[in-house]
Amino acid sequence: MNFFDNTEVAFSLKSDSELERAYFLFKMIQNQPMVRIGTAVTNFALKAKLPVEGLIRSTVFDHFCGGVNEEDCLPVIDKMYEKGKVCSVLDYSVEGKEGEAIFDETMEKILKIIKFGSEKEAIPYAVFKPSGFGRFALYQKITAKKELSAAEKAEWERVKERFDKVCAVALEKNVPLLIDAEESWMQAAADDLLETLMETYNKDKAIVFNTLQMYRHDRMGSGNVPGNWQP
């Protein structure tokens, strides 16, 4: 059954005014010159510390984001679960930033999300991207099987420690953990690491899950899925 064949069901969580606002927003997004101008103006306003956050929050942000933190997301999470039994996954979106302090901060945020989700029936999973725990170029170099320098080896050990700590807490809190697949030219490094972690943490039940980029036809066969868990 395709629920979107019945718009009354598909959009039951939205009021008429919310649907009208969403329609207007998508019409605006289709206008590329308007998007370019709006992006430039918004970036300027934020850098100039102009009071535009309320406007952003009431338009683009609230349509595409649940909130600025876990607690801020709760009204949307509860509404979707209570009215439609729709579960939520909190996705910490800080892509593109690199640095050991940033990676540690991201790890702590994921740990907090796991603990937060363990108390909420409406949040059945936690998720993170490998590039949130380590440099993209490092994954890429390992995927290409290039030799690492001493500093890079130490850096990779820190990446593995972050993965391991998060997986351990996911097991402790009984929260399934999805590791979001990324670009093919860095994914093998993440796959190999995850296969080891799945062997460690999925002994009694599946807690750690690798994911696939479905546009990659070479990933579709079960034999090509790294770390398959067998009950």
Where do the protein language model's features map onto the residues?
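Alpha/beta catalytic barrel-like cores
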Residues: M1-L177, A188, D192, T196-N202, ...
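Short, surface-exposed recognition loops or helix-turn segments adjacent to catalytic cores
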Residues: P176-S184, F209-M214
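Aromatic-lined glycan-binding groove of carbohydrate-active enzymes
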Residues: N224-P231
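Short, conserved secondary-structure transition motifs
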Residues: L212-S222
